[in-house]
A protein has these predicted regions:
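Peripheral, non-AAA+ core regions of ATP-driven protein-machinery
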Residues: 1-198
């Protein structure tokens, strides 16, 4: 497999636009390029991706790697495309199976160490993905609580690139306790807990 497509999403004001991240790996002068009406922070993600993969234990092959974002007429902003780019590249070089990314949306920022960081707009993105026929979403662990508000869609909240690879290769997923703790805490609070309320 030298080509792959991963579903993701972008916020356009208050609206959500589904975005498709394509990765093509071919012979030629080693190069990593990204195209498709990208903001500076999205263009910079190629360096985060390369370094994060290295620190996760995966060295990109010395080939021409092209990342394309569809549709081209939508301006891609923010760092939430880091994780789908990683997923697309890993699929294109054969680290994760293509079938695992079918009907799956991927959103998330990554650090240079390979950790996955939270992004804004997860709730509307997951809701729109469900409306478009997506059956599962891979999101940052810290976004799990809001993602789980959308029912009848599988949510995989990951803390690292390594965990995403594990899940996409059929590994066991253990739901984080983050959302449950937040929900429990919210139920326990009442007005007497707020200073000045009696």
């Amino acid at each position: 497999m030298s080509f792959s497509t991963v579903k993701s999403a972008a916020m356009e004001g208050l609206a959500v636009e589904m975005v498709y991240v394509e990765a093509d790996v071919s012979d030629g002068m080693p190069l990593f390029e990204m195209v498709g009406s990208l903001s500076p922070e999205v263009k910079e993600s190629k360096e985060r991706v390369r370094t994060a993969l290295k620190n996760t234990g995966y060295i990109l092959p010395p080939k021409r790697i092209t990342i394309n974002f569809i549709p081209a007429n939508i301006r891609k902003t923010g760092s939430g495309f880091d994780l789908p780019v990683v997923a697309a590249v890993l699929c294109a070089i054969g680290i994760v199976p293509e079938e695992a990314l079918k009907d799956t949306m991927v959103v998330g920022e990554i650090s240079l160490s390979g950790d996955v960081k939270p992004v804004n707009g997860i709730l509307p993105m997951v809701a729109e993905a469900k409306e478009r026929g997506v059956t599962r979403c891979i999101v940052p662990a810290e976004n799990q609580t809001e993602a789980l508000l959308v029912k009848e869609i599988e949510i995989f909240a990951v803390q690292s690139i390594a965990e995403m690879i594990h899940i996409l290769n059929g590994g066991t997923y253990i739901e984080k306790e983050i959302g449950k703790v937040v929900a429990k805490t919210a139920q326990m609070l009442d007005f007497s807990d707020i200073q000045g309320q009696y």
